[in-house]
């Protein structure tokens, strides 16, 4: 009889013991979390599922196709690297991001290590040049220290560094022409990344580094291209964009812009290896209406038969340029098409062409 009673009571006793252990564990966890926050400050440790940490806010790139490929735009509180050959649209891409930040009331800074920023061109892209913070540092150390202080202020939403290749170490500047200072720039970037990464996460500031391409000597097989400044930036960047000029836009013999293709080479906040294409017009920047037309065609909102584009059964233009002109002149139709495009993209409508496609083995060779 006593054996049956003990057997019946055993599960209850085990559950009480488990509850007691769980209570002690929770108490110990709360004590250590409180101790860590007292020692290192509030927010030094947190649960990943907190609502404030789950969703990564973004800054628009200025190109709807690229926003789609990135999962919304440049992520806030992260490091972004944009690299590519000369005259491919790197600076234009970042100036559009600056204009977007300023339009929303934020503060942006441009660290012009190349000493090549054109304020007239920046203003034509919508940048408020009077309120844009600009620094033209003498050395790489000075540039990165300015970047660090801007980040730690938590008052700046976006910092652009143009470019990593122009961040010349002090030892190289103070030395004589022809002196070999091996690895000095890579060491400088590695130290800077270690120092600023933590502050970027706390302040929510986005830092975009522009970078140039170099060729590895003696590479017979594989891609000989590499970026400057060592490997540190490759590891610390949450997003890496490879931008290339794939076509020159012409009207007759007059060149009026380029067609750019961006490969998302790395993305920690959305699926990587997507591709976006858009037009960059000389003196005007990214063609937002051109991006809209591309996506409207891919989502079957605007149809194309031969050279003619049609919307709701009516022809709106013969050829891409004429259709873009029609959309510029008919703002009501443009806004309606944009609303439909965003609605379809939000619903997960499949976009099948270059503006958003995984870079598979087959199309990687084609790209």
Curated annotation (Swiss-Prot):
Gene Ontology CC annotation, any one: cytosol
Feature: compositional bias, Basic and acidic residues: 15-24
Primary localization class, coarse: cytoplasm
SUPFAM superfamilies to which the protein is assigned, alphabetical: P-loop containing nucleoside triphosphate hydrolases (SSF52540), RecA protein, C-terminal domain (SSF54752)
Biological process annotations from GO: DNA recombination; DNA repair; SOS response
Cited function: Can catalyze the hydrolysis of ATP in the presence of single-stranded DNA, the ATP-dependent uptake of single-stranded DNA by duplex DNA, and the ATP-dependent hybridization of homologous single-stranded DNAs. It interacts with LexA causing its activation and leading to its autocatalytic cleavage.
The protein's name in its UniProt record: Protein RecA
Species of origin: Prochlorococcus marinus (strain MIT 9211)
Encoding gene (name): recA
